[in-house]
Amino acid sequence: MRRLILLFLTLCPLALRAERASSFVNTISGEGDNLPPRYVMPLLSNGDISIHFDVQGTQTISSYAKGVDGVLWEGRRLSDLGPLLSFGHYLQSVSYGGRQWEKPDTWTQTLDTRNAEMICENGYGDALSVKTEIIVHAAHDIVAIRKTFSALKPLPGPVSFKFRYDLSSRPDGFSLPRRMFFTPRWDAGDRSLDIDYTAYGYLDYNGRISLLADRPVTADESLEGLGLSLDVNPRPGEPVSVTIFLLYSDNLATQDFASEIQTFKQLVRSEGYDGLANLHRKIWDDWWSRAEIDIPDEILERAYVGGIYELLTNATKWSFPVGIGPWEGRFFAFDETCCYLGLASSNHLDIARRAPEFRKKTLPHAKSRTANTGARYSWESLEDGKEGARSGYWHDHIFHMSHVATAAWTQYLYTNDLAYLKEVAFPVMKECARFFLLHECVEHPDGSMTIAAVTDLERLGPVKKNPFFTSCGAIYTFESTVKAARILGLEDGLFERFSDAAARLRKTLPNDGEKYIPYPGCKVNSIAVVTGMYPYPVLSTDDPLERKAILHFYDERYTAGNMYAIGSGLCPWYAAWIASALANYGDRDKSLSLLQEAASQIGYFSEHFEINEKDVIRNPWFTTAAGNYVHALDQTLLLNREDDVFVCYSAPVEWKDYSFTLPCYGNMTARVEVRKGRLVRCDISRNSWSDTSAGKTFWIPDYLMTPKSIGKTALPLMEKVDGYYKFTVSLSDGETLSLI
């Protein structure tokens, strides 16, 4: 991705500023304890260990806009309904010349999403500067924090530094977390401070946290002063560095956590900060190489990069929560699929498949909830698939089963992986379809069929009969399951019942004669009406009722722009949701305006929010918004819809120079480049997710090319249809087809 113009944003009269050196680099600067409005600590995470850091590279225990601070470790729970266990937070003390500095005089904080690394630069008086570099390692549960002390002029004596690991769960006094017991000890042979712990929570957890440094240190083994300290003597032009390593392992991660900790100790001592960071960056290099976009809108690109970073840092070994902090890291199948779609369309399909694999693994529990008459997944799934939600009418949601099926099916559409379809996707899809058929489809005396009374979207209230959103999801589940069965060569009378149910549900979709509505008799506006186009592509773009419904919601979007009846704006994940729906129509102007509206609400570190408007702010680092945004921007550039691939379909006409590399359905990749308003490259090649590819029809707007620009090999495949050049593409092994 290209370098972007440096962008300065004045935040307040006290010279705070946010800088953008590239779409990956997010920097803010300030003085003292003066933070910019709506500052949220940036996130470093590897999907297990999740930590937000402040401007000194430490942590405060304060909750802002429902942001969660402290060291979190996904999967370690106090109870089924309770929070994740608290693993404390990091503090420090810096002193020299007889003064201890609680806060720096000046500070700069940078989150580099390219390398998943944080850099803080702090000035303490006029003589000392401290640079902090931090990674949460992508492959290991290791946190590495390097402090570099620089003397700006001769110091009056040594600098005393202490890294303190505060295990307290309270900001106003020392109090150990509930049901957690710690035993710190200094291991002189290993030169490490090892903290063994036992936690009695949802499971019984036993583990070890080890602190060590790459320089001689003094250890404080007391629980209230736990940490490592040392004195350093930097001179002008001769900085001194020390790296603190924090190693985590427990019985949920491995059967022998003590051995894993020893392996980690050997690794950090052999590699040091630079070696660990290089290994870490190689993993992130691979992730960033999967999809590439270069677009002329700097803010859209920055939000895109931030969205992918957010999705990758919250990709747990189980699946994708709305964030490891929000909602205690539980897994909503609805939000999980939003994350899935963002990862899938950005070509991170090996990571994306964790969602359908998680649902396959927890399928036995989902079936047990219906006495084996279909799969009913928990509303807020724990890591074992069991329910983590408190009682409420949200338990009457059922559309999340169609989200589960959608992710499972979409993974096959992208990869063309028959083994995956047979072993993972189809069993999940079939049981979700059985659930809808046997539990939720109501047959009426006149032969019609509707979905029973359920909670559709929470803002619409409970007990809505024949809801549009849920009905479209059921239709898509039925129809995609039947398609999967045909691909696998399976025959069963049950599949005929699925097809029949889908056909009958189509006939009873609620409408007012002009447009589809959320449920019969509904008088309020709701985003529910866009779902027949996205995320469930069950309706044709020629369906006038759906088109009018989507445009009506677009026109009235600020009347129902949040999941909850709060605020007066359009939340970013709704904006991206509508943009995805409108991308199916090639509506460039509206899609672009919605993407810009979503992107305008990201934070200083490109984080996406659940809500971020003038008077309401909720849940920063909200992965649902990140997933919706990434997928929506991908769809404006390359829209996949069953057997059709639309190239630059909703890309703004005013964009004259841009390029992208994105995955296509059928296990293919499109590498596209537009220069001076003309297509100069469109290479279709086989992707790497399976050994085969499926033929697809590619559509390219005619304003981007002429017949003379079409490649000789592609010319026989070309057909001109209604303002588009149409190419039917089927690739052999190793083949790349250049349409230009």
Briefly describe each language-model feature range.
Residues 329-365, 397-418, 423, 467-641:
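Active-site core of glycosidic bond-cleaving carbohydrate-active enzymes
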Residues 18-52, 58-330, 361-364, 731-740:
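Acidic/polar, glycine-enriched structural segments that form the non-catalytic walls/loops
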Residues 1-4:
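Positively charged n-region of N-terminal signal peptides that target proteins for export
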Residues 8-17:
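Hydrophobic h-region of N-terminal signal peptides that target proteins for export
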Residues 276-289, 295, 299, 318-325, ...:
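Short coil/turn segments at secondary-structure boundaries
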Residues 250-252, 322-332, 373-423, 431-499, ...:
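The feature captures the catalytic groove of carbohydrate-active enzymes
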Residues 22-148, 588-739:
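Non-catalytic C-terminal accessory modules of carbohydrate-active enzymes
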Residues 245, 410, 429, 434-439, ...:
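Structured mid-domain segments that build the active-site/substrate or prosthetic-cofactor binding neighborhood
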